[in-house]
Amino acid sequence: MNFLKWLIPSRNERELKKLWPLVRRINEIEAGLQKLSDDELRQKTADWKTRLSQIQDREELARTLDEILPETFAVVKNACRRLTERKTEIIVREHPLLWEMIPFDVQLIGGYALHSGRIAEMATGEGKTLVATLPVYLNALTGRGVHLVTVNDYLAARDSEWMGAIYKFLGLTVGVILHDQPPRVRREQYNCDITYGTNAEFGFDYLRDNGMAARKEEQVQRGHYFAIVDEVDSILIDEARTPLIISGPSVHTYDEQYAQWKPLVESLVRAQERLCARFLSEAEAMIKQLNPTDGSNPQNPEALENQIGMLLFRVKTGQPKSEGLMKFLEDPENLKLMNRAELDLHKDQKKVDLYREKEELLFAIDEKGFEADLTEKGRNFVSPKDPEAFVLPELTTLLHEIDTGPEPDARKRMEAKTKVQQDFETKAQKIHAISQLLKAYSLYQRDVEYVIQDNKVIIVDQHTGRLMPGRRWSDGLHQAVEAKEGVEIERETQTLATITIQNYFRLYQKLAGMTGTAETEASEFFDIYKLGVLVIPTNEPCVRKDANDAVYKTRREKFNTVLNEIKQIHALGRPILVGTISVEVSEQLSRLLKREGIIHSVLNAKYHQQEAEIIMRAGQRGAVTIATNMAGRGTDIKLGPGVAELGGLHVMGTERHEARRIDRQLRGRCARQGDPGSSHFFISLEDDLMRLFGSDRIVKMMERMGLEEGQELTHPWLNRSIQQAQKRVEQHNFQIRKRTLEYD
């Protein structure tokens, strides 16, 4: 097969081969530009702008841009050369940064891919940020505005200052859209030749312009000509599940309901904890019966095994993250019994037994579907004196009965109808408030899905690890979380305007994107956005050493090993970047390192203000940095003096993410541009990915090998099994995105 690959070049290789003559042409032109003065070089920008401003026809404009592409790319490359040779210092996010970048040949190819409306897949560290300057400069000459879309405000501000040095040197204007800017400032930024910002800011401005601006003068955007999306997989795939929503104060607000029902839901959650603890102690007693210490044979072992499996399944359904359950499942035999019980319950198409098992609980939690539902037992607990408390009557039937009833007085009939409607609304509000509070208590975890800052609940973006101030969960969920945390419950909102990310980006005449990881989702990019992917070769071969994943039974064993590896690598003087999946885990690991006396930095949603300084220090000798997936994108960790000789940056992942791309992004923080580096991922069977989407094959393999406490399992086959689990989640999320688009 490898022989055939060598014999028949891939489509990607054929595409690249066609582009090398263009690269040679750009370099020839650039050599000739070196004798021009700065003013003569800048004059080219003015001349092209004048020429392009006279072209109205879209096809003619596209032809002209293709025609001038070699010279415009050469001009950008020459401007970079001048800034480098003059050792120009640029102030980026209040830090002086020496300009030392001149586009490589492979970056020129990346620039062409973007101009032609494709996704350029470039390995992390290959300078995607610089690549974008080539097509951005070319298309900005049209005067129609080019939008460069980043994953967060920090990168938008950073890149507008950093890459802005090139554009300004060549005579173009650069703007940046940031959270909390007033409309007047936003309008000025959009009127620049080039505008940086996040997808959310661009999308919300579009919604405000088209849903809330009364006059054209109140609008801030001026059209959708060309957008380049940085980290395109994060924005067009990961975030595409969430539509952008502008909301206003709700006409009817029931915020007091959440505070009113909070004590009841709290007592319900505590009662469920006691119930699950009882099931676990019953299971423990049965396990002792199954394995008697006196060597005798247990009576009816099969029935005992079934009962143990059912009890463990109940706890998994009622309290899936219970520490007691995790401890039980450390024994592969118990895990096997629970999985077998679950399989038996799902065999019956009518799900009678499954329903009966769930009815032993007060509420059932579905982690995959992010749902929590009261059972009959739970409804009786919440409302023991009113069995109909959670049954909504048929309103139209009740109103019809009043209209056709014996009451002759029209006013009294109207009063009766008003009372029926009010009772119905009160009941519906109560059911809704209790349902949302139950979700808040059982599915939304502090320092994972959200953090508390300044007495407010702030959502944490699960893909970027960053805070999302100003964003609120809809449908009363945010109020439920506020009630749970005892902070001020803000007023409920109603949707005024909404658009999906997919449909917003379809507004652009031309769309392109960059990422280190697009090939895995190439078909989705093409199906939804009609974007092809061109994989750009690296400038220097990657010499990173990727160790096989280390798999442990428990989180405790996993973190002990992570700690030991940090100590070993730290003793060598190599810098270490430890990736975590949530704020909570990053702080837990930080406490362990403090106990060991290891000086380190923490980069998570709570400390995002120090991001630039932390990243600047992360590649220095002996540095230890713990980071959520905030550090996975757009951050360039440069190695300090003498670090390359020690082996470069060592990246450690404490868990596999739902999306393989995010793991690849973390790995890509090291061994950039031919530097040395290494990576190692650590996994436990208690991690969410393995619990929810993992395979029984891994458990069976660990069982066969009879692993002792603290022993790890590593094998390339195991890596494939973990990737299969990730693929299952990706497929699950792809179906959600398809449905989101269908209903927009």
Where are these regions (language model features)?
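Conserved P-loop NTPase motor core
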Residues: M1-G706, R737
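C-terminal accessory/connector segments of nucleic-acid motor ATPases
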Residues: N733-D744
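C-terminal helicase lobe
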Residues: D696-N733
